[in-house]
């Protein structure tokens, strides 16, 4: 790049076309990159990003009041602190571990097999648009105990809500659509909440309806916000991670052969995908006080964006970080799906992703089904791979061919 990285905008189309081409220069020359148009900083070095995420007293989630609450209908888990955060996080976690996870595994398998079935005889599919997006929504609806016949409208409304949260800026028309989608979800979910209070089952909404915080039942508003929180967090990254993993395994045939021969390597492939191409690229924080980041003094109330993709490619944290390698010794596989993960795809600190273990289980199950059912899987001839997204990022499509059933 001939132009100074300090004069370059990470909000430009040029950057969004391939952000990975600029991460190294950002880390080396401008690790605390200022974007004047939004008066915010973008932080790219691993140790700076990890420090920010692990110090919520200084780097707060206050910005989510504007970035999330209008469409989430209330505070999300990442905004909560102390006893409230611990208690409500524990309630949600109950649906992602132990017996609850065992209960969800057959549903994950059933969704994957049912959605793949129409494509198996054809011998080709788009793993993003034919399968992944619908799969992620259907699994989340099963977890919540919602009627999957409504998955198309839930998917549409979810997309509108996600656009609000993951857009650096929105047009008035796009903002109005996002708020409308949030209202539609609210109208859809409120009767479900009231019904589950009377007739609870084993689903997450029932768990929320029958749980207490400080001796009191959660309000309908609290439950609605937590449902929307789960819907967004469980759906948005899942389809992207699966498609990214399959694509990079296909581009590294020796590693694909290793995985096909030894399925115990699938968790390594998932973890390396999360490091190499994290679906969540940006995590915002707002300063509670003047502080110094990477040698730069930043004023109170300023918003900083942690660049997860750039941090996960930092050579100070990982050897040969720009190489996809499921066998890397510094992957930290034992903790890769927890708050102690070396990679930062799940965040870090007290606000790390509550569903990390569930995400691993979900993607491992569906990846094995894809590899079993789609024998001799390969990219379609003349397929042109592309990714999109600044805040969250994943393949636009993934056209694969395979030996039909």
UniProtKB/Swiss-Prot annotation:
Family matches, as InterPro entries: CypX (IPR030904), Cyt_P450 (IPR001128), Cyt_P450_B (IPR002397), Cyt_P450_CS (IPR017972), Cyt_P450_sf (IPR036396)
The UniProt record lists the EC number as: 1.14.15.13
Q: Which reaction does it catalyse?
A: cyclo(L-leucyl-L-leucyl) + 6 reduced [2Fe-2S]-[ferredoxin] + 3 O2 + 4 H(+) = pulcherriminic acid + 6 oxidized [2Fe-2S]-[ferredoxin] + 4 H2O
Check the record and name the Pfam families matching this protein: p450
Q: In the UniProt record, what gene is named as encoding this protein?
A: cypX
What is the name of the protein in this document?
A: Pulcherriminic acid synthase
Cofactor requirements of the protein = heme
Q: One GO biological process from the UniProt record? A: pigment biosynthetic process
Please state what class of enzyme this protein is. Answer: oxidoreductase
Superkingdom of this entry's organism? Bacteria
Belongs to which family?
A: Belongs to the cytochrome P450 family.
Q: What does this protein do?
A: Involved in the biosynthesis of pulcherrimin, a red extracellular pigment. Catalyzes the oxidation of cyclo(L-Leu-L-Leu) (cLL) to yield pulcherriminic acid which forms pulcherrimin via a nonenzymic reaction with Fe(3+). Substrates with small alkyl groups (cAA, cLG, cLP) exhibit weaker binding to CYP134A1, but substrates with larger hydrophobic side chains bind in a similar regime to cLL.
Quaternary state and interactors: Homodimer.
Molecular-function GO term, any one: oxidoreductase activity, acting on paired donors, with incorporation or reduction of molecular oxygen, reduced iron-sulfur protein as one donor, and incorporation of one atom of oxygen
Repressor listed as a keyword: no
Per UniProt, which keywords does this protein have?
Heme, Iron, Metal-binding, Monooxygenase, Oxidoreductase
For binding heme, which residues are annotated in this chain's numbering? 62, 229, 285, 353
- Natural source organism: Bacillus subtilis (strain 168)
């Amino acid at each position: 790049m001939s132009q100074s990285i300090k004069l370059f905008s990470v909000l430009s189309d040029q950057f969004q076309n391939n952000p990975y081409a600029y991460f190294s220069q950002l880390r080396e020359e401008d690790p605390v990159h200022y974007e004047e148009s939004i008066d915010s900083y973008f932080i790219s070095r691993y140790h700076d990003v990890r420090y920010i995420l692990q110090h919520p007293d200084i780097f707060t989630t206050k910005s989510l009041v504007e970035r999330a609450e209008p469409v989430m209908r209330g505070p999300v888990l990442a905004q909560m602190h102390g006893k409230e955060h611990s208690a409500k996080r524990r309630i949600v976690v109950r649906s992602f571990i132990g017996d609850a996870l065992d209960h969800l595994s057959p549903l994950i398998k059933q969704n994957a097999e049912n959605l793949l079935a129409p494509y198996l005889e054809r011998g080709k599919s788009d793993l993003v648009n034919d399968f992944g997006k619908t799969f992620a929504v259907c699994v989340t609806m099963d977890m919540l105990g919602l009627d999957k016949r409504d998955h198309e409208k839930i998917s549409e409304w979810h997309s509108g809500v996600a656009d609000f949260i993951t857009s650096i800026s929105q047009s008035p028309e796009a903002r109005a659509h996002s708020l409308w989608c949030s209202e539609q979800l609210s109208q859809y979910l409120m009767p479900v909440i009231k019904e589950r209070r009377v007739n609870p089952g084993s689903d997450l909404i029932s768990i929320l309806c029958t749980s207490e915080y400080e001796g009191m039942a959660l309000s309908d508003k609290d439950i609605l916000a937590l449902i929307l929180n789960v819907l967004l967090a469980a759906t948005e990254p899942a389809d992207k991670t699966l498609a990214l993993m399959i694509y990079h395994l296909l581009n590294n045939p020796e590693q694909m052969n290793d995985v096909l021969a030894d399925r115990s390597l699938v968790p390594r492939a998932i973890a390396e995908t999360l490091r190499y191409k994290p679906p969540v690229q940006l995590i915002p924080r707002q300063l509670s006080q003047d502080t110094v980041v990477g040698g730069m003094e930043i004023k109170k109330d300023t918003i900083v964006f942690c660049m997860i993709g750039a941090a996960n490619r930092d050579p100070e944290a990982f050897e040969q970080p720009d190489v996809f390698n499921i066998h890397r010794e510094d992957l930290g596989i034992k903790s890769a799906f927890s708050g102690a993960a070396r990679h930062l795809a799940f965040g870090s600190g007290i606000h790390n992703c509550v569903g990390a273990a569930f995400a691993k289980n979900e993607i491992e199950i569906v990846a094995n089904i894809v590899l079993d059912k789609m024998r001799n899987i390969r990219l379609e001839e003349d397929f042109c791979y592309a990714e999109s997204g600044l805040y969250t990022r994943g393949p636009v499509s993934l056209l694969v061919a395979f030996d039909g059933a």
